[in-house]
């Protein structure tokens, strides 16, 4: 009787998402789908890091063989501080959502949130070139998408916020990028002073989660205006409901941004960017089913 040859299964590269809370995260499902689509040998898990123990959790994960990680609230700024090197997007965002452990043992940080937003906008609207864009909010979500929007060659980017000084601070920061290359495209404006129709209005605030609306004038919405809320849900967000009432040409929620930023992270780690359409449909169907 001869021995059967042993078959060894190649070890899966380990990835994870860190957050607190983390149980709601759709990242393990999304990256599991991406791995299947691209036939990449990897595992992806959600890790609940203690509020005061993110760094220890992350370093333990890497020491145990982890290759890369996503980071969600409330750890994006802590992740930024831990990185040995950073992308331009992460540097300007002041926050990191994607970490890679490099061959020399150092940690590289990137921020793919804005790249995911722009990819989803282009999927819906086509080119963003020359468009007049209003960005509502001046927090971390807004800051992470300004450089990708500018790189997409928008014609004008107006930032508005309840606390106007925060919007102006972002304008001053990003006006200095690449020797002032984008300074003539950037402007801040108080909400009551907004005038004229915009081609695109992006809500980066979390107001929709509480069913609230930023105090925006109706006049900014025309019959060719597209409105985008970074929040999402089974039903239209409060912001997108308002946009429909103003007869906006198109309303879009942030589910595509979620899938898009994940695809950019996956591509950074694996060198292949997965198609997002099938995963997006699965998530949309799951949202609807869970709401019933």
UniProtKB/Swiss-Prot annotation:
GO cellular component: cytosol
Gene3D superfamilies xrefs: Leucine Dehydrogenase, chain A, domain 1, NAD(P)-binding Rossmann-like Domain
Pfam families: SDH_C, Shikimate_DH, Shikimate_dh_N
KW Amino-acid biosynthesis (keyword) present: yes
EC number: 1.1.1.25
GO molecular function: NADP binding; shikimate 3-dehydrogenase (NADP+) activity
SUPFAM superfamilies (UniProt xref): Aminoacid dehydrogenase-like, N-terminal domain, NAD(P)-binding Rossmann-fold domains
Protein name: Shikimate dehydrogenase (NADP(+))
Gene field: aroE
């Amino acid at each position: 009787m001869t021995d059967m040859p042993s078959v060894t299964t190649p070890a899966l590269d380990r990835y994870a998402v860190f957050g607190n809370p983390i149980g709601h995260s759709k990242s393990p499902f999304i990256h599991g789908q991406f791995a299947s689509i691209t036939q990449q040998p990897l595992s992806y898990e959600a890790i609940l890091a203690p509020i005061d123990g993110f760094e220890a959790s992350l370093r333990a994960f890497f020491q145990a063989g982890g290759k890369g990680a996503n980071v969600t609230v409330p750890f994006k700024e802590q992740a930024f501080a831990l990185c040995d090197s950073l992308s331009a997007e992460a540097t300007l965002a002041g926050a990191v959502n994607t970490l890679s452990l490099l061959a020399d043992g150092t940690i590289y940080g990137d921020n793919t949130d804005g790249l995911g937003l722009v990819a989803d906008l282009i999927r819906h609207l086509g080119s963003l070139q020359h468009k007049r864009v209003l960005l509502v909010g001046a927090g971390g979500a807004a800051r992470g998408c300004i450089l990708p929007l500018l790189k997409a060659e928008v014609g004008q980017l107006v930032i508005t916020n309840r606390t106007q000084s925060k919007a102006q601070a972002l304008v001053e920061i990003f006006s200095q990028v690449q020797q002032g290359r984008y300074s003539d495209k950037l402007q801040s404006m108080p909400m009551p002073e907004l005038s004229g129709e915009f081609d695109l209005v992006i809500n980066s605030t979390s107001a929709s989660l509480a069913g609230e609306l930023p105090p925006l004038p109706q006049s900014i919405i025309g019959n060719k205006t597209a409105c985008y809320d970074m929040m999402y849900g089974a039903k239209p967000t409060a912001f997108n409901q308002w946009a429909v009432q103003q007869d906006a040409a198109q309303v879009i929620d942030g589910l595509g941004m979620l899938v898009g930023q994940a695809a950019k992270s996956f591509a950074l780690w694996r060198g292949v960017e997965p198609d997002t359409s099938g995963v997006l449909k699965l998530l949309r169907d799951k949202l609807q089913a869970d709401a019933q």
